[in-house]
Amino acid sequence: MSPVFNVNVGVGQSSALSPILFALYLLPLIYILEKYLKNLEISILIISFVDNGLFISQSKSFDISNSRLFCSYNIFSNLLKKFSLVVEYFKTEIFHFNRSRGTFNPPPLNLSSLESNILRPNNIWKYLGFIFDKKLTFH
């Protein structure tokens, strides 16, 4: 390993090289996270497209789903800290899908104990140009 030294140049966000460097740097962290979650038997699917990452939990119980998301977020934010990276809390969102016909009022995900905020579920979710609603009606 080389010694640590200061660098006064970088790659801009609009550069074609940015997503490649981001993926090369972040992919080992995602791999480590997946191994941690598997060992802890926490069922979470991780999807990443450039710098947009998703933790997906499927459960009929909000408590179970939120618990899985909380643990995943905690482990991932700690991994990021070890690599001198941080989660942009203001960009963190939670969204629940439910196709039942009854009242749908999902609980928030409280991340305040992890130096983050309380995530209140959104009514719509925009991801990579697609707009989703809670019932997946795509109107």
Question: Each predicted region: which residue ranges?
Answer:
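A generic structural signal for short coil/turn motifs at secondary-structure boundaries
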Residues: Q58, F62-N66, H139
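Hydrophobic (often cysteine-bearing) scaffold residues that line and stabilize catalytic clefts
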Residues: S18-Y25, I46, R68-S72
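Conserved pre-motif C helix in the palm subdomain of viral-like polymerases
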Residues: V7-L37, T137
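Inter-domain linker/hinge segments that demarcate the starts of reverse transcriptase
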Residues: S65-S84
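Reverse-transcriptase-like RNA-dependent polymerase core
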Residues: M1-V4
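Ordered, helix-dominated protein-protein interaction surfaces in large eukaryotic regulatory proteins
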Residues: L24, P28-Y31, C71, N78, ...
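Catalytic palm active-site di-aspartate
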Residues: G10-S18, L40-S61, L80, S84-H96, ...
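Short, conserved micro-motifs composed of acidic
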Residues: V86-N123
